[in-house]
From Swiss-Prot:
Coiled coil: none annotated. This is UPF0325 protein YaeH. InterPro entries: UPF0325. It comes from Escherichia coli O1:K1 / APEC. Belongs to the UPF0325 family.
Length: 128
């Protein structure tokens, strides 16, 4: 699993926290950030540089002109797919945790309101 990341020398892909991708001249720069350990100020990161792939395509629908375009390297595309799998998994876990906490807070308020209602009913009974 995560063969493309392992080919970059990343032995523990599960420790990846996030990544960034930017274009610089004719290259794409991929920076991968790892989870911080306790007591660390900065997350460890590694940087990779990929030359952009050049293609010649028809410039207009008539087919009389051509232009050169650059696009992301196919290898980098596969690496980004793996990074997205890792980072999306982490986001969905965070979203689930947030949902559970929200549900607990809602349940807490419902129970608190119900307890107040029951106590008010008991108070009415004891006054009679």
């Amino acid at each position: 699993m995560y063969d493309n990341l392992k080919s970059l020398g990343i032995t523990n892909p599960e420790e990846i926290d996030r990544y960034s991708l930017r274009q610089e001249a004719n290259n794409d720069i991929l920076k991968i950030y790892f989870q911080k350990d306790k007591g660390e100020f900065f997350a460890k990161s590694v940087k990779f540089k990929y030359p952009r792939q050049r293609k010649t395509v028809v410039a207009d629908g008539v087919g009389q002109g051509y232009k050169e375009v650059q696009e992301i390297s196919p290898n980098l595309r596969y690496i980004i797919d793996e990074l997205d799998q890792i980072c999306q998994r982490d986001r969905s876990e965070v979203d689930l945790k947030r949902k559970i906490l929200d549900d607990l807070r809602h349940l807490e308020s419902v129970v608190t309101n119900k307890i107040s209602e029951i106590e008010a009913d008991l108070e009415k009974l004891t006054r009679k």
